[in-house]
Amino acid sequence: MLTGVYLATKKDKTVYYRSNITHKGRHISLGSFPTEVQAHQAYTAACELLSGTETIDEAFYRTNQLAFEKIVSLINFRDNHMYIPTPIYLRKNYFSYYLSIHRELKFDIDDLFYYLSLIHI
């Protein structure tokens, strides 16, 4: 099995592949994939994002390997040392919530705790 890939079986006995990564002690699921190669590509992309310097806009070309929400979460974790499973990126005095690749909402940082209370981290 390739690095970062785990075999899984659905209730109907269909085989699929899970990909995950552990970074700074945090276990992060990267998703489910139909092939081992695709799951490994997601793992490789996550490794590159977490060790690189790409901005969110520069990293969106990786959506063929990872969901854009996961890209935002990983880059936020790399840059701000806080893993948020929703597509939130912390900035100085405000944060961005990405509805899609081309749709970014900006909120005052004081509102962050409200949004975090809605999710389980």
What are these regions (language model features)?
Residues E48-G52:
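Sec-exported extracytoplasmic/periplasmic mature domains
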Residues I119-I121:
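Conserved small/polar residues in nucleotide/adenosyl-binding loops
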Residues A39-Y43:
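Short beta-strand segments enriched for Tyr within beta-sheet-rich domains
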Residues T53-P87:
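Intrinsically disordered, low-complexity charged/polar segments
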